[in-house]
């Protein structure tokens, strides 16, 4: 029940992006989520791709073509792993700098969210209490009908459904009334939170124009440094791919020639 109430509060205030604020555990930072998702994605693609290559090479067609795709795949995986190892520290430095530059703004927004949370908590408690009462009332009204279903014959099923239908409609209407009341109570706080965020961003833009310019300059500088530091690693990747692609091309041409000879000899 509490999960329903908390979800409604999130939707009324700031949308789905505020879901971590209402949780007790400290949420993972956006930078850590991006890095973890990227790592998991690359690992899944790499492992899954190798399985497909291995299955193809073990098939009759793969053995006949003898393209040595698995060896090429391992060489490519080694080259990509080397690239990730070289770029990793540079990428980490970029995320750390960006997180540091936005620390003040995030702290101010956390304070605003905490203040709004304290103000709306009584409304959430009241809504939870009313909803619990409505559900309990519905359960009490339905209980005799459930006993009637167990005791009655099959022909009474339609009659029972007709009796249940208005009760369900009544519960939905009551729930809708409570939800509308809660939305009306929380709307000023959601608007207040949005206004505070807009005001802080506007103040940062007007009174701290130099700070925004500095943020953009630093971000541009970090990206330029990332591109420069990544160039050697990307060049190593390109050089590592060339022999792999050439080996694949030669193997494929040889397989095609062999197949052509077999067809001509038949």
UniProtKB/Swiss-Prot annotation:
Record field: transmembrane: none
Q: Where are the sequence repeats?
A: 67-88, 89-110, 111-121, 122-143, 144-165, 166-187, 188-209, 210-231, 232-242, 243-266
Q: Region annotation 10 X approximate tandem repeats: residue ranges? A: 67-266
- Residues recorded with modification Methionine sulfoxide: 109
Q: How is it modified after translation?
A: Glycosylated. Palmitoylated.
Entry's Gene3D superfamilies? 1.20.5.20, 6.10.140.380, Apolipoprotein
InterPro entries noted in UniProt:
ApoA_E (IPR000074), Apolipoprotein_A1/A4/E (IPR050163)
Question: Which cysteines in this chain are paired by disulphide bridges?
Answer: none
Instruction: Specify the superkingdom.
Output: Eukaryota
Q: Which GO terms describe its biological process?
A: acylglycerol homeostasis; cholesterol efflux; cholesterol metabolic process; lipoprotein metabolic process; phospholipid efflux; positive regulation of cholesterol efflux; positive regulation of phagocytosis; positive regulation of phospholipid efflux
Extract the signal peptide range.
1-18
The protein's predominant localisation is secreted
- Report the SUPFAM superfamilies cross-referenced here: Apolipoprotein A-I
Q: Which UniProt keywords apply?
A: Cholesterol metabolism, Glycoprotein, HDL, Lipid metabolism, Lipid transport, Lipoprotein, Oxidation, Palmitate, Phosphoprotein, Repeat, Secreted, Signal, Steroid metabolism, Sterol metabolism, Transport
In alphabetical order, the GO MF annotations are: cholesterol transfer activity; phosphatidylcholine-sterol O-acyltransferase activator activity; phospholipid binding; protein homodimerization activity
Alphabetized Pfam families for the sequence: Apolipoprotein (PF01442)
**An example Gene Ontology CC term for this record:** extracellular vesicle
Q: Where in the cell is it found?
A: Secreted
The record describes its quaternary structure and partners as:
Homodimer. Interacts with APOA1BP and CLU. Component of a sperm activating protein complex (SPAP), consisting of APOA1, an immunoglobulin heavy chain, an immunoglobulin light chain and albumin. Interacts with NDRG1. Interacts with SCGB3A2. Interacts with NAXE and YJEFN3.
Q: Which PANTHER family match?
A: APOLIPOPROTEIN, APOLIPOPROTEIN A-I
Q: Which family does it belong to?
A: Belongs to the apolipoprotein A1/A4/E family.
Protein task:
Participates in the reverse transport of cholesterol from tissues to the liver for excretion by promoting cholesterol efflux from tissues and by acting as a cofactor for the lecithin cholesterol acyltransferase (LCAT). As part of the SPAP complex, activates spermatozoa motility.
- Name of the molecule in the record: Apolipoprotein A-I
């Amino acid at each position: 029940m509490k999960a329903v109430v908390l979800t409604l509060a999130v939707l009324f205030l700031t949308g789905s992006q505020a879901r971590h604020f209402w949780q007790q555990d400290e949420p993972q930072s956006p930078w850590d989520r991006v890095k973890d998702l990227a790592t998991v994605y690359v690992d899944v693609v790499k492992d899954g791709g190798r399985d497909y290559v291995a299955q193809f090479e073990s098939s009759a067609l793969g053995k006949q073509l003898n393209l040595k795709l698995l060896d090429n795949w391992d060489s490519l995986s080694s080259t990509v792993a080397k690239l990730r190892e070289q770029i990793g520290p540079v990428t980490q430095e970029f995320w750390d700098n960006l997180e540091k530059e936005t620390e003040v703004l995030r702290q101010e927004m956390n304070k605003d969210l905490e203040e709004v949370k304290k103000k709306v908590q009584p409304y959430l408690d009241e809504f939870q209490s009313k909803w619990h009462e409505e559900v309990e009332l519905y359960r009490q009204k339905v209980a005799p009908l459930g006993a009637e279903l167990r005791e009655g014959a099959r022909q009474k099923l339609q009659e029972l459904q007709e009796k249940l239908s208005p009760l369900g409609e009544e519960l939905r209407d009551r729930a809708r009334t409570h939800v509308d009341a809660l939305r009306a109570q929380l709307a000023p706080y959601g608007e207040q939170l949005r206004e505070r965020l807009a005001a802080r961003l506007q103040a940062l833009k007007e009174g701290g124009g130099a700070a925004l310019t500095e943020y953009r300059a630093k971000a541009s500088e970090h990206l330029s440094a990332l591109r420069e530091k990544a160039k050697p690693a990307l060049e190593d990747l390109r050089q590592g791919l060339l022999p792999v692609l050439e080996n694949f091309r030669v193997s494929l041409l040889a397989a095609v020639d062999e197949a052509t000879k077999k067809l001509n000899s038949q």
